[in-house]
């Protein structure tokens, strides 16, 4: 059950929790960004923008007039934000470089994160259909949602093997 619908939290409690988490995220993000880039203000501004954009994307997932999570776009955003952006961003913060193999690693994480979202959406397919929430499983049905899930997992496994054979990790 959803936390508000189940009565575990009121709307005000949920909003306060979101605000506290946003404040903590901004504080920690700024500290890490400032530490990583010292006085390179271009990268500081870029990463602050990406941080704010990520927070807004998280809020727009389920809130607002047209939350994209209710229209089948959650998978794309999860792949981008939890996969590519989080891996690229973390890597760049630590190395100040961009390497194409990070795209493979970000895609692996992205496919697995979308897999978790897909499992939740499959579980909720009946209720989401009643609530007119247009997730991928509600659009394609239970049977094809399972095939979609197989694709997500197999794609991540194939990319793991691709990365492991192409880029041997040495001591």
Where would I find each of the regions flagged by the language model?
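Juxtamembrane transmembrane-helix termini
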Residues: 35-38, 64, 122, 126-127, ...
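Alpha-helical transmembrane segments
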Residues: 103-113, 168-171
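Alpha-helical transmembrane segments of multi-pass membrane proteins
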Residues: 54, 58-59, 109-120
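Intramembrane alpha-helical segments
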Residues: 5-100
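Acidic (Asp/Glu-rich) catalytic motifs at the cytosolic membrane interface
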Residues: 1, 114-137
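Multi-pass membrane catalytic core of lipid/isoprenoid biosynthesis enzymes
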Residues: 1-38, 133-169
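Transmembrane alpha-helical core residues of multi-pass small-molecule transporters
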Residues: 21, 53-54, 78, 105-109, ...
């Amino acid at each position: 059950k959803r936390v508000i619908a189940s009565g575990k939290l009121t709307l005000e409690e949920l909003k306060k929790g979101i605000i506290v988490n946003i404040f903590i995220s901004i504080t920690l993000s700024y500290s890490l960004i400032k530490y990583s880039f010292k006085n390179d203000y271009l990268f500081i501004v870029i990463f602050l923008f990406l941080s704010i954009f990520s927070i807004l994307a998280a809020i727009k997932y389920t809130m607002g007039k047209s939350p994209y999570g209710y229209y089948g776009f959650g998978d794309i955003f999860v792949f981008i934000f939890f996969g590519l952006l989080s891996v690229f961003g973390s890597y760049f913060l630590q190395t100040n470089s961009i390497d194409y193999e990070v795209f493979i690693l970000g895609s692996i994480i992205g496919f697995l994160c979308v897999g978790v979202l897909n499992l939740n959406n499959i579980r909720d397919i009946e209720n989401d259909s009643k609530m007119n929430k247009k997730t991928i499983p509600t659009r394609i049905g239970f049977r094809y949602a399972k095939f979609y899930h197989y694709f997500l997992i197999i794609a991540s496994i194939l990319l793991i093997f691709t990365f492991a054979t192409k880029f041997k990790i040495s001591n």
